[in-house]
Amino acid sequence: MKRIIKNRKEAYYNRKVCYCCEKPYEQAHSFYKEMCHECGEFNLLKRQQRTDLRGYRALVTGGRVKIGFETAKLLLEMGADVVITTRFPRDAYKRYEALHNFSEFKHHLQIIGVDFRNINSIHNLILYIKDKPLDILINNAAQTVRRPAPYYRHLLKDELLASPCENIISLYGDEKKQQEQLFPHIVNQSLNSAAMSQLKLLPEDNICNPDIFPPGKLDKDGQQIDLRKMNSWMYQFEEIPILELYEVLQINLVAPVILTQQLMPLLMHSGRKSYVINVSAMEGNFFAPRKNSRHVHTNIAKAGLNMLTRTVSSHLKQFNIFMNSVDTGWITNEKPNPQNLGPDKRKTIMAIDETDGAMRILDPIIRGIGGSEDFGKLFKNYHEYPW
């Protein structure tokens, strides 16, 4: 019996079912190895689409790594003026600076250090952004797996000591003074976004084990390797710390609501159609099967973000603002490192990558500029999907 069950598991994980249409296929697409030929061709066409965004101004929250980085990069390459937010602006700048075509769009990029856990950070961001109209708002920033303070410690030196940079906008005044304030009374000081990552708010923020966060070891995204045996993606409902519940709701839901509301006047006065994209996920989808009691806090936050789209989009349409939600697809395995997805190994190579996720975000905008007037919809794999 055990052998039969094992064979069934192997058959499930080795099955050839298209990532998009979920139909069986015999021959995989040449580029997308987990798609049928038809879906692969469609996705490749979408991956390569572009439009002229010269004269457009965009705000992308969470633009330092992964999908947020790719989204901002594509907007810049299409000619847009782009403002990104991140807790670590110096690290973000280094990532953009490393791009081969950075000199072509350097003067169109602004990076702002913001910690969305702090309502004052959001307020300061809004005050800065309000200097001129906005065409595109992409609510991408999210906390899915909470990382402890030591995870970010290696970034602090550059963030607090680096010389001024024309691409980085500081909302916090003199950072050298903030560095002096960092210790020993960190909780009581006014900190910049990078320094706030070192606040010790939960027991995990006191981890000192180099075997868990090995110094100098980075993952495929250039981020600290995290070898914890458990993380918040695996938390059952009763295991979620109250503070983490608050952080997730604040970052993933409250911040997008505030930004959309407060930046409405800028979106209304852009002089053309403007766009709000709420970056969602299947965790927040009521229609999706296979729901369980893990990471309930992220599910709730994404469901709330979807409800923002459903309830506000018709109102925004009156002002020529087109709001939609987009599921970017499964790009990162959030399970803790030792966990296995299949019978033999942890899945690390996904069916799509960050560029595919970014193009899913940008697709409603590109089609909108081409004449489409979609609003109040959830898109998955470029198609409308049930809520």
Regions found by a protein language model. Give the residues of each.
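Residues immediately within or flanking Cys/His clusters that coordinate Zn2+
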Residues: 15-18, 33, 57
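Short cysteine-rich clusters marking metal-coordination/redox-active sites
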Residues: 18-21, 36-39, 276
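Cysteine-rich micro-motifs
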Residues: 29-42
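Canonical Rossmann dinucleotide-binding motif of NAD(H)/NADP(H)-dependent dehydrogenases/reductases
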Residues: 44-86
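A glycine-rich helix->loop->beta "capping" turn
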Residues: 106-110, 128-139, 151, 209
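Conserved Rossmann-fold cofactor-binding substructure of NAD(P)-dependent oxidoreductases
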Residues: 114-132
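Catalytic loop of short-chain dehydrogenase/reductase
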Residues: 142-249, 254-257, 261-320, 328-347
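Core catalytic loop region at the nicotinamide-binding pocket of NAD(P)H-dependent oxidoreductases
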Residues: 359-387
